[in-house]
Amino acid sequence: MKFKSLITTTLALGVIASTGANFNTNEASAAAKPLDKSSSTLHHGHSNIQIPYTITVNGTSQNILSSLTFNKNQNISYKDIENKVKSVLYFNRGISDIDLRLSKQAEYTVHFKNGTKRVIDLKSGIYTADLINTSDIKAISVNVDTKKQPKDKAKANVQVPYTITVNGTSQNILSNLTFNKNQNISYKDLEGKVKSVLESNRGITDVDLRLSKQAKYTVNFKNGTKKVIDLKSGIYTANLINSSDIKSININVDTKKHIENKAKRNYQVPYSINLNGTSTNILSNLSFSNKPWTNYKNLTSQIKSVLKHDRGISEQDLKYAKKAYYTVYFKNGGKRILQLNSKNYTANLVHAKDVKRIEITVKTGTKAKADRYVPYTIAVNGTSTPILSKLKISNKQLISYKYLNDKVKSVLKSERGISDLDLKFAKQAKYTVYFKNGKKQVVNLKSDIFTPNLFSAKDIKKIDIDVKQYTKSKKK
């Protein structure tokens, strides 16, 4: 009985000690980390914040349309950010953990709204214990150099450029297919790489390829020859090819099923878009792959499609535009101008091979000029940061300094995280309005008294915002 009593007492003490340790640990964690209201269980949902990011691989940047999503005002660790960064590296560029470990360099930079930044090594596996608030992050840039310095030339990599054409539309690809130099590879291995970039760059899966009208890739060799491979056949030649002999690879997929199965020549016609007097360089072309002969009604539909895709101009925008037309330039020197809003089409047919280029011109109505964009700078405690965006000010009527105050406070909050309360306790908070006539007006952001003067947004040249905060004394 004494033995049983001893065991019972020992177990009880162990439970109490364990409970006490857990309680102390939780208490210490709660004391070390401030309560994050966005993650409280009292709330039914989270308010998210979108943080833009860029990826640079071997010196080549890629335009990223998506953003990293975090809970607003959440305190997170650098390990949490690293997991997000590794995820988008794998999803957007196919770079795995192994690739990062074997890379020459792999790092990401966190840019903060106060103008500071922090560089983190993705290969180190060492994390600082600091926590950062998601609302303080302005952007994240990821930089990976996968090119290991080869100890001998036999181990160097070869980069093979490739293009992807889907339904007649080409896309400019900034990355390359990577192979070991002088590596003998099979067409099956090559097909695996091609299918991988089709899925990562254009979202085309194996199922999409099987159901497509046509799916093939062309291997262009440095000796001038080429070989076309059907991605749907599943049949592979036993020949091996040397990676150093490949000049480029062209991938072509037509996902549009048609009744006719005749293979026809693919005609590409270059085009440009001029919107409100500003032209942009268009890397893709208009394609006439299935029917080189077309009427002007179909051509107008294609023009409207690229306007929507490239510049976001809808049918409604064209309807209210001041001007909306396109000019077809022919190889024989002739040209034809067609109105995009007209419903009357000539019965003439045009052959794609006769078209030299197409210029699209759109001038939007007064709706596009309803706002004026004024450049501005922000200096906090004497440190300025370049602002890529501009202050959007209504151009419809005369504005007051109270209206301008609200705009300035809004960008201070969004760009540098400075709230109304921060301004109230700031040492100094003001902005200077520079007018085009050479005059200027200094406005105190801490004052609620405004001059009754009204002025037009078109008269403003620029705005400089200056905030000086009291420095916090360090606790000893």
Swiss-Prot record:
Coiled coil: none annotated. MAP repeats lie at residues 45-153, 154-263, 264-372, 373-476. Residues 1-30 form the signal peptide. Keywords: Repeat, Signal. It comes from the Bacteria. The keyword Repeat applies. This is Protein map. The lineage of its organism: Bacteria, Bacillati, Bacillota, Bacilli, Bacillales. The gene is map.
